[in-house]
Amino acid sequence: MTEKQLDLFAGPMPVPATHSLDKQVLDAAALSDAELIAAIPEAGIGECHTLAREAARRRLAAAVLALKALCLRHTGFGGQRVVPQQAAALDALAAIGCREASRAIGDLIRRGAVEGPGLTLAVAAAAQLGSPLPEAIITNLLRHDDPQIRAAAARCAKPWPRTAPILIELLDDLHREVGMAAACALGQMGRAEARMPLLRALRDGPSEEIIDAAAGIGDEELIVLMGRTTTIRPDLTRTALEALETLDHPLAAKVATRIRAAEDCDSTRRRIPNP
């Protein structure tokens, strides 16, 4: 992605025309699905968030094309600041979260419909939904100046030939979030380069993403730490168990059995009334 040079002598950026709805229609909850969908593509600044949030609240998959159209209407206007209509549409697509929404976000990125701060929102949504993006675009995004975009792009990465070397470089990124996202992506690919960062992360700040990535490598030290995580973070017990069960390793089976036994003891203890 190439950054546009800022013209210090340029006038204010043009703003696309919008067609505000009559104020009495702004009760979005009162609109039918069809009325809501019809209103979204032409929504102005005043009503875009209200309409998009309502579509998200309803998990309205039928609104995906309308939300995408709202984003496309504002192509070219977000180089220096977030376009409210695009932000509203992207947030709604991420909340709706269906396959069509995932594809729509990927298509918006491929077509260059979002840029600047809006691209940050779009790539984060793509990572959240697993939007399909080609290797060439992910490779460019991994080199982006914005660390938030680099981190989100790492979460979108697949084991392509040109991607892994860039992710290995990003392990030493100055921004911790980027390095951790790169380590998780490499771990999912089974790359040994991610082993040490994932060991540190399991000790210092485990999460679902880190556990899943560690399972991609699954050596004995990582397996032991995945098991210990359940005593430090009981809320991650289910994630750790599921990850261990994917590993064809006798130690993983042993650790999983130990975790289940501890769960059974805790459950029994809770059922016994205090004297």
In which residue ranges do the predicted regions lie?
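Initiator methionine at the very start of the polypeptide chain
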Residues: 1-2, 275
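Short linear clamp-binding motif
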Residues: 2-10
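Structural detector for internal amphipathic alpha-helices that build alpha-solenoid repeat scaffolds
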Residues: 9-28, 38, 42-61, 69, ...
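Functionally critical, cavity-lining and gating residues within the transmembrane helices
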Residues: 102
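Terminal, low-structured helical/coil segments at or just beyond the last alpha-helical repeat
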Residues: 253-275
